[in-house]
């Protein structure tokens, strides 16, 4: 925009450096980010990465009187927790694949006795795009869920098992 004379990206990357000034900072260090926003006299913050959103950066900046665009911590749970998203869909009659949220192996095994394969296994929480597996055998489901329960994706030890749907994928967020 011609109304903007300077853009900063925290932390930025090689691509953003063509358009903006990259500032190396831990995106979860909200206090340091606030100091940098004030130092550079930034008028508006647009939050992109999921992790700071899930941890509440929008709430933190608003509390500190910073103009910010992005979902608050509660709304960010739609992206940050697959289990939360599925529960919201179920409670509001939003069409979604049939699912079961599990936090222990015996729940998984019980679900395997009543469902059809393949099954989609999703780590609840942020997993850098690596927390979803399409499992075609019960053995694969047990292996993937065990990895999650054992902390593979540190963000959660909960899994969402859901029926496999064919077709185009669509995201809510």
What annotation goes with each model-predicted range?
Residues 1, 15-17, 69, 91-93, ...:
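Solvent-exposed alpha-helices and their adjacent loops that cap or buttress functional pockets
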Residues 69-131:
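A conserved helix-loop-beta module that forms one wall/lid of the active-site cleft
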Residues 23-27, 62-65, 86-88, 115-116, ...:
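Short, hinge-like loop/turn segments at secondary-structure boundaries
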Residues 1-74:
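ATP-binding N-terminal substructure of ATP-dependent carboxylate-amine bond-forming enzymes
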């Amino acid at each position: 925009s011609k109304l903007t004379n300077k853009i900063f990206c925290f932390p930025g990357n090689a691509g953003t450096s063509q358009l903006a000034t990259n500032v190396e900072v831990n995106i979860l260090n909200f206090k340091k980010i606030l100091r940098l926003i004030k130092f550079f006299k930034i008028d508006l913050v647009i939050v992109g990465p999921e992790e700071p959103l899930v941890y509440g950066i929008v709430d933190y900046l608003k509390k500190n009187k910073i103009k910010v665009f992005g979902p608050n911590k509660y709304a960010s749970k739609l992206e940050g927790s697959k289990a939360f998203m599925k529960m919201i869909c179920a409670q509001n009659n939003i069409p979604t694949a049939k699912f079961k949220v599990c936090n222990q192996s015996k729940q998984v095994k019980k679900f395997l006795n009543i469902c059809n394969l393949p099954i989609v296994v999703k780590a609840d929480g942020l997993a850098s795009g690596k927390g979803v597996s399409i499992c075609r055998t019960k053995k694969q489901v047990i292996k993937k869920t065990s990895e999650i329960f054992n902390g593979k994706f540190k963000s959660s030890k909960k899994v969402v098992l859901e029926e496999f749907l064919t077709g185009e994928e669509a995201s809510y967020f």
